[in-house]
Amino acid sequence: MTAILERRESTSLWGRFCNWITSTENRLYIGWFGVLMIPTLLTATSVFIIAFIAAPPVDIDGIREPVSGSLLYGNNIISGAIIPTSAAIGLHFYPIWEAASVDEWLYNGGPYELIVLHFLLGVACYMGREWELSFRLGMRPWIAVAYSAPVAAATAVFLIYPIGQGSFSDGMPLGISGTFNFMIVFQAEHNILMHPFHMLGVAGVFGGSLFSAMHGSLVTSSLIRETTENESANEGYKFGQEEETYNIVAAHGYFGRLIFQYASFNNSRSLHFFLAAWPVVGIWFTALGISTMAFNLNGFNFNQSVVDSQGRVINTWADIINRANLGMEVMHERNAHNFPLDLAAVEVPSING
């Protein structure tokens, strides 16, 4: 009798690390994208929390007029924000070691750039991690594609727009009131409400909410009865069960009679594709709109487009919006400009001597 002994190859430390990183048995999947995602998102989150609580005022406009954004400097949850990096820094890469001191770095809004750049890297890696986990499990890749919409939107307001405008000081502040301020100034300078891509984004977000509510209510209203009146309808579903938990034929029949036959999906797969694609495409277009307006390709201008036979202007809603835009324009960054650009661009009437 001959015994054959095989020597088991010992896996290297690197090999075990690779197996652990790419294992789908972990409670939370890490993946190669996660190796970069975890430190970048932890850094962005940590600095955000510290700066939101304790960062000193920032000279956002580069005119020696610091703006307070943290809780310890007089703000609350609504008014507080991470103030964007100073206009004096512009688009320069501004890590801590580029400043003469930490005080100077804080005064010039260094934390904003640190948070934004780490955050964008982190969410991009999160998207890659979604694809990676789908790939490992043999799933289709559309979860990551759907997530690309909010990633594109965040990249547009935090990176593309500052690049187009020439300074990180024009990026969106990281706070509630700061977000509203960004929206108001964006409307004043770019007339975003009159941009078709923003309109598509509104249709995507509101339409997505409507379709989500319609789908959820239709499914909930056509559940197959599995319980008595004395227990929750949710008890009628067991995780992983093979049979349908609702009657799609009944839901299709109801909605087809409520609207008309062809307004109702009779294919569950095409229905769920539509529910995913509608808001995603809308938000893609909004991100594209922000990215084009970043380089001053602005919304439609229909100002003073209707005149009477005497040449007098008959105001339309476009003129009302324009008047609001001018008001917002003259009020923002009020000490940074000698005269607002939009008003200064108007041709001065000639005076006959």
From Swiss-Prot:
The identity of this protein, by name, is: Photosystem II protein D1
Q: Which CDD domains match?
A: Photosystem-II_D1
What is the recorded membrane topology of this protein?
Multi-pass membrane protein
Excised during maturation, the propeptide residues are 345-353
Q: Which InterPro entries match?
A: D1/D2, Photo_II_D1/D2_sf, Photo_RC_L/M, Photo_RC_L/M_CS, PSII_D1
Which segments cross the bilayer? 29-46, 118-133, 142-156, 197-218, 274-288
UniProt enzyme class: oxidoreductase
What GO CC annotations are associated with the protein? chloroplast thylakoid membrane; photosystem II
Q: What does the record give as the organism's lineage?
A: Eukaryota, Viridiplantae, Streptophyta, Embryophyta, Tracheophyta
| Species annotation | Secale cereale
Example of a GO biological process term? response to herbicide
